Curated annotation (Swiss-Prot):
Organism (species): Mus musculus
High-level lineage: Eukaryota, Metazoa, Chordata, Craniata, Vertebrata
Catalytic site positions: 225 (charge relay system), 270 (charge relay system), 366 (charge relay system)
Major location category of this protein: membrane
SMART domains according to UniProt: Tryp_SPc (SM00020)
Keyword hit for Glycoprotein: yes
Disulfide bonds: 210-226, 335-351, 362-391
Function of the molecule: Serine protease.
Extracellular topological domain: 37-416
Tissues in which the protein is found: Expressed in esophagus, cervix, tongue, and testes.
A molecular-function term among this protein's GO annotations: serine-type peptidase activity
Sugar-modified residues: 107, 235
Membrane topology classification: Single-pass type II membrane protein
UniProt name for this protein: Transmembrane protease serine 11B-like protein
């Protein structure tokens, strides 16, 4: 019988298998290395600080006050000029941010200290610095406005990320981790990490019961009625961050300063200052909010944000994560209507929310911040959560202590 000849299979030599495996591993290593390299390069961030002089400005101490009208007006002009200069330059793709940090008045001039952030995956960093400096110098030389600037006074140096964050976090109302949007805490939504870095949790024996706002290294602002149950500093602690538990950056309380005219059980002068035993170390997630000038006006219809760990509904459950809600300031006359609060709202109070209800502060939010951003996206403390009729009721918006009415009192107790 015929049988076909079966060819014998030749086995692959072990050395060839090893060589193939090593080749594949080497190729994978190269690919991963290139990915890591390009991702690292793409995310290379450079930080700078510098300054220049604005001439022909009479000496005025108000330029030193970061919250003054004069300081914000001049800073806004200079920031707009920098944005325009960089966005119209050949490095506009590398540009991230630029801010005026401080203004220092002198005889007939003001020195603007600036802070800048760029990314550049390809250029030598010294070349990038020179290009930035050149654009700034050209901006100062070609100034068509009435503002007179001194190009020769320009200075610019690269700084580390640590130093850059320290500079920005020492200024009030800035949000390095800022979100591009803030949503519409009864009817609110969860806050992002570092989105509201001045928000604090006031605790009795470790349990959250009121909110507060960080206004200085050792001072917070809250509601006086938060201390109706206890005003012994030894029982109180303050913590920060977005989670109500576990406590983050917990601090002990040294002193509670309640407004002298506050009467327990009433709503007038519902303001208190908390002094901590030690300074708070500011970082991207924890730093102070700006206090408005006593003359600053926040008109009806202005958008504001309230934050806190208060109940989702009246006598309802409380969140573990910080909540935020966008609301609007309501005209006092409207809030004093018979349908609303029937004349109980005085000049030291303000209403905020919606007359149709649903979005509001609630139990556990008391003492917390009501804030508003100015045109430079710097946030100011407008109100302190005080009282209301339950939460989110129709014609019963939240009532807040108006911070501008207590600005001088706050300064007398804190030096801020």
């Amino acid at each position: 019988m015929y049988r076909p000849v079966i060819a014998s299979r030749k086995s692959i030599p072990p050395w060839l298998i090893i060589l193939c495996v090593l080749g594949v591993l080497a190729a994978l290593g190269i690919i991963i290395g290139l990915l890591v390299h390009f991702l690292a390069v793409e995310n290379k961030i450079y930080y700078y600080q510098g300054g220049f002089k604005v001439l022909d400005i009479p000496y005025d101490r108000n330029y030193e006050r970061e919250t003054s009208l004069e300081s914000n007006y001049l800073s806004k002009i200079l920031e707009n000029k920098m944005v325009e200069a960089f966005q119209n330059s050949n490095i506009y793709k590398q540009y991230i941010n630029s801010q005026v940090i401080t203004l220092v008045p002198d005889n007939n001039s003001v020195t603007a200290h600036i802070w800048l952030v760029f990314k550049d995956p390809w250029s030598n960093k010294e070349n990038l610095r020179r290009r930035i400096e050149s654009i700034l110098r050209q901006m100062l030389e070609n100034n068509p406005e009435s503002l007179t600037t001194d190009p020769g006074s320009l200075k610019l140096t690269e700084i580390s990320k640590v130093d850059a964050e320290k500079i920005i976090n020492n200024r009030c109302g800035r949000r390095p981790r800022m979100s591009a949007t803030y949503d519409r805490i009864t009817g609110g939504s969860t806050a992002h990490k570092g989105e509201w870095p001045w928000q604090a949790s006031l605790r009795v024996n470790g349990k959250h019961y009121c909110g507060a706002s960080l206004i200085g290294e050792r001072f917070l602002l809250t509601a006086a009625h938060c201390f109706q149950g206890t005003n012994n500093p030894k029982n109180l602690t303050v913590s920060f961050g977005t989670r109500v538990t576990p406590a983050y950056m917990q601090h002990s309380v040294q002193e509670i300063i309640i407004h002298e005219d506050y009467v327990k059980g009433e709503h007038h002068d519902d303001v208190a200052v908390i002094k901590l035993t030690e300074k708070v170390s500011f970082n991207n997630d924890v730093h102070r909010v700006c206090l408005p000038e006593s003359t600053q006006i926040f008109p009806p219809g202005e958008g504001v944000v309230v934050t806190g760990w208060g109940s989702f509904s009246y006598n309802g459950k409380s969140p573990l994560l910080l909540q935020k809600a966008s609301i609007k300031i309501i005209d006092t006359n409207t809030c004093n209507s018979e349908e609303a609060y029937g004349g109980r709202i005085v000049d030291t109070m303000l209403c905020a929310g919606y007359l149709e209800g649903s979005i509001d502060a609630c139990q556990g939010d008391s003492g917390g911040p009501l804030v508003h951003p100015n045109s430079r996206d710097i946030w100011y403390l407008v109100g302190i959560v005080s009282w209301g009729h339950e939460c989110g009721r129709v014609n019963k918006p939240g009532v807040y202590m108006r911070v501008t009415s207590y600005r001088n009192w706050i300064a007398s107790k804190t030096g801020i």
